């Protein structure tokens, strides 16, 4: 079985992954930013030619880049956020080669995701936010897609995944605002300066969705998260019936993991 761990930011995905990993020690864990057979968040996705160009540009990081790169046919996946360096502009430069945030066309976005899922035929994996979070977030905030368009996307993807062994563990937040407040504190530095929240809020405020709807600020972002959670659970019900479990965020029993 492959376990897809989903839920909003701050819902407790890391803790659930640890529990599943302990329960299934023979399963491989894939967290955000890791090389992942189906998900490309926090990774650059480039042609062989562009890859060689990047190696030439960052000669001093050649070994580190090669160690964090993976070949997929004519493409290369670079897990650049896993490379610790103080080389100016390196991470910002490679960020442009991600597939999210309108960096590729809608058509290429869909093709890349579907192609990787079609080729995926593995078992015994635990995957963090590899099915919903980044795709749904992108389609809402950057493609300005309607709920129906997103459901249509997943209806097609569901057919691709019909014969694959998977179960979705969805962490549902009963109080989204409270959960966000918790991670605001957790993701602050030693002086109490918030590190994550200002970046997330800026990301939301600058998105095509926010600009098109004339919204911004914390309340609007929370409203977006509430909507996203409702939509993701609807996808579970309509596209993946019998293949998901909804757990109360940070308030479930270990026995509920037995499916």
What is each residue range found by the language model?
Residues 128-130, 147-202:
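Conserved phosphate-donor/acceptor-positioning beta-strand/loop module used by diverse small-molecule
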Residues 8:
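P-loop (Walker A) phosphate-binding loop of NTP-binding proteins
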Residues 21-76, 139:
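Conserved substrate/cofactor phosphate-moiety recognition/catalytic segment
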Residues 11:
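ATP-binding Walker
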Residues 195-259:
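NTP-dependent small-molecule kinase module
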Residues 65-161:
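Glycine-rich phosphate-binding loop used to anchor ATP phosphates in small-molecule kinases
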